[in-house]
Amino acid sequence: MIDKNVVARIVEEWLEDKSKFMAIKEVSERYLELRQNALDYTFEQMNLQLENDKQVYLAVFDIPVESAIIGNKTKTLVLVFGLNIHIYCANGDAVTGLEQNAKAKQAMQSLFISCPQALDEMTLTHKTDFYESKNVRAYLKTRKGVYFKELTGETKKERFLEMLMRNVTEEVNFRH
């Protein structure tokens, strides 16, 4: 016999925070740690002087990947303003030093110059936990905090932000 109160409580929790129920852990602990460390990185740690509250200094994109390998369905692109381009794979592998590619670094600089245009369609959030999705999840960090948007392609600014991201991934031969 199914307890209707238990079902009602679960549905209520799901409606309040769907991300709890979407967090399918087909990712390694190392991946989660690398990803969270990137999201926790502050402009103070970088000794960076930001010009305004809309200047983005960190961009993190969780990108779904077509893969038959369990634990390898997501890759995260991490861009640190003027410094680094990294890719973290859900299985825990990390590819670093991609900023050595001059074209990739130029694409990253273009992203940081242009991505603040998308902030007004994003949500300032404290929730950065990983979850699976068929869409790219974008996190842009400013002095005010982390802005989030799941890129569904519904708006011009979403498509623009995804295009900026793909310009970087194409230069580092990232396979989605």
Residue spans of the language-model regions?
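Short, well-ordered, aromatic-rich surface patches in folded extracellular/luminal domains
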Residues: 2-61, 132-176
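Short, flexible beta-strand-to-coil junctions
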Residues: 62-73, 142-144
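Long, positively charged binding patches that form subdomain-scale interaction surfaces
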Residues: 63-65, 92-93, 102-105
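Short, surface-exposed coil-to-beta transition loops
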Residues: 70-77, 133-134
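Short, solvent-exposed coil/turn segments at beta-strand boundaries
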Residues: 78-86, 143-145
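Acidic/histidine-rich, surface-exposed loop or edge segments in extracytoplasmic proteins
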Residues: 85-98
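Short, charged, low-complexity patches
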Residues: 100-108, 112, 158-166
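Short, internal acidic amphipathic alpha-helical interface segments
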Residues: 103-135
